Amino acid sequence: MGKIVLRLDRMMVERKMFLNELAERVGISNVNLSKIKNNKVTAVRFTTLAAICDALDCEAGDILEYQKDS
């Protein structure tokens, strides 16, 4: 089975936004956002995903990617 990964790093670079600023806008800690950014979590709440999309002015599909097993 494949997996879903978050590509926050690309969108953050495009938006010229640092981790601390995004964490503050989303309302979560730097540590938790770092775990999300580095795909070290197994689940993300839809409310958190929506807040990230609001802060980065993007759609969920812009930061979510499906990777097939190789």
Features from the language model and the residues they span:
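Short, basic-rich loop-to-helix N-cap that marks the start of a DNA-contacting helix
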Residues: K40-A51
